[in-house]
């Protein structure tokens, strides 16, 4: 996103700003839709499974996601937002479409499994918090893209993006270790 918004802001601040506002609107709209689905499904699961079982399942899922990150196998599909729209859609609509696509969570690549961990915890432990968590994640994502886009001029992204930076594998390992520890603690405390 910053690889598009940064140069767009450099060429035309109004166009770049429209892209970022569209990105915000799309992310929040899709996060709201996802949170509704998580809430309904999570409340249904709560009717079937007791709290200790839901906590245990959450913990096991967090451990699995953490191990996947540690093994550099974060679960996601190999797809990014549709690149062909860069030259055909106006900036605001492009941001809206891409933001909506990103906030659906299942449709694009992921850097770490933290997204899946939050989604699992919201679904199984506290479905009523799903709107706060998912919209909050969307706002943080847009804020991150905005800050990275504004700092584009100081530190341009390489042609391969930030993923080739030396800190990236460490970030994924730290996320994986955190998920494993949190998952193990969740399972350990589930039946206390």
Regions found by a protein language model. Give the residues of each.
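Alpha-helical transmembrane segments
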Residues: 50-66, 125-142
């Amino acid at each position: 996103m910053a690889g598009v918004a940064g140069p767009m802001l450099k060429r035309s601040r109004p166009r770049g700003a429209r892209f970022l506002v569209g990105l915000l609107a799309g992310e929040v709209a899709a996060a709201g839709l996802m949170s509704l689905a998580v809430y309904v499904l999570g409340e249904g699961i709560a009717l079937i499974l007791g709290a200790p079982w839901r906590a245990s399942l959450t913990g096991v899922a967090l451990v699995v996601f953490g191990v996947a990150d540690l093994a550099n196998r974060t679960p996601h599909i190999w797809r990014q937002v549709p690149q062909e729209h860069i030259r055909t859609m106006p900036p605001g609509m492009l941001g809206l479409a891409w933001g909506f696509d990103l906030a659906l969570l299942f449709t694009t690549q992921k850097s770490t499994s933290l997204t899946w961990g939050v989604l699992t915890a919201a679904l199984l432990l506290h479905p009523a918090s799903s709107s706060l968590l998912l919209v909050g994640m969307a706002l943080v994502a847009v804020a991150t893209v905005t800050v990275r886009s504004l700092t584009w001029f100081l530190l341009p992204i390489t042609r391969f993006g930030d993923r080739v930076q030396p800190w990236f594998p460490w970030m994924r390992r730290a996320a994986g270790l955190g998920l494993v520890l949190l998952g193990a603690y969740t399972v350990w405390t589930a039946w206390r």
